[in-house]
Design a protein with these regions (language model features):
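Extracellular/periplasmic helix-loop-helix junctions in multi-pass membrane proteins
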Residues: 134-147
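Membrane-interface extramembranous regions at the lipid-water interface
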Residues: 1-45, 52-91, 95-134, 150-178
Length: 178
């Protein structure tokens, strides 16, 4: 029997590097503008900081897309979320708050089915992603980006462990989708 070849999982080190670069850019930005802006002014980041924040957000969406590409190529598994849908629903206001809990739940369904016990906790991923978005938009974009990729590291780790298991026997079909 030939080993299972799936598309590769996302390279998360790129996200961590972008997060670290964003934190460094924030520190440089802060040291260049030591005085506080007037409370009526909206702080506008420098171009290099904005580009790092933008590229970090885009790379996060690339990683989400990649997870769902991998899930769609698993033999015997019908993943209910297309890669485009997984990314697209992040842009719908209010619904995206639900979505960051929903797509990890579907990946956890696969992981828990492969282990035949609840190994992956999708609520934890959803809470980490939600906390990362709050951190990213209200407090610190760089640390928020690093927190996003910590959540992705948990997902990748669970998927790697599930892929390392021997193939499932045909008598144990996957659970139906909701």
């Amino acid at each position: 029997m030939q080993p299972l070849t799936l598309p590769p999982l996302p390279q998360l080190w790129v996200g961590y590097l972008l997060g670290l670069a964003t934190v460094v850019a924030e520190l440089i930005e802060g040291s260049n503008h030591a005085s506080d802006p007037p409370p009526t002014d909206f702080p506008i980041p420098n171009l290099y900081l904005f580009l790092l924040m933008f590229v970090g957000a885009v790379y996060w969406l690339v990683c989400v897309y990649r997870y769902h590409v991998v899930m769609g190529h698993i033999p015997g598994w019908k993943h209910p979320i297309s890669p485009a849908r997984a990314v697209g629903f992040h842009f719908i206001p209010i619904y995206n708050l639900y979505w960051v809990f929903k797509w990890p739940q579907e990946i956890a369904r696969f992981v828990n089915w492969r282990f035949a016990q609840p190994v992956m906790k999708p609520q934890m991923v959803g809470l980490m992603v939600f906390a990362a978005f709050v951190m990213r938009f209200l407090f610190d974009p760089g640390l928020g980006l690093i927190l996003l990729f910590l959540a992705a590291s948990y997902v990748s780790g669970c998927l790697r462990r599930a892929f390392a298991l021997p193939p499932m026997p045909p008598k144990n079909p996957p659970p139906p989708t909701e």
